[in-house]
Amino acid sequence: GCGPVIGIAGSEKKCQMIGELGADAMINYREENVAERVTELLPDGIDVYFDNVGGAILEAALDNLARDARVVLCGSISEYQQEHRTGPKNYTSLRASEADMRGFFVYNHAADFERAEVDMAGWIKAEKLRALVDISDGFESMPDALIGLYTGENLGKRLVRVMPGEDVIF
């Protein structure tokens, strides 16, 4: 296994949820200095960082990489609404730590979806994986559900059940 696993979220409720999912420690980026807290929790640096946020959180991670670390870029929600996207200002931290940074786009792995679905269903059944979903009901809830992703209102995967009572979810 790996460890310790550190979760970063923007509310106490989300940090509590991360702890319940098994993280060893949580950082509330709205209340704490992320870079300082990462240094405290991981004095030898980050070995693997999976980024969905970008911006200042990614920069804090890049400043705290262990030698030969791996950084995976999956999303950058902090940048999606920005007119001018800047990317990490401190990307040269990768050179000093001899780290690797690469992108991950789930749809490039479509050939693996069926196998992944079977594997993950097994993990859920064996209680090795918990799927957290935040479901809004009704087609008319779609705009608010989308906006909620950008404002941090969701707890888990945000889905919309188009027809309440049905299993058709987007």
Stretches with model-predicted labels:
Residues E114, E140-P143:
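Residues in well-ordered alpha-helical elements
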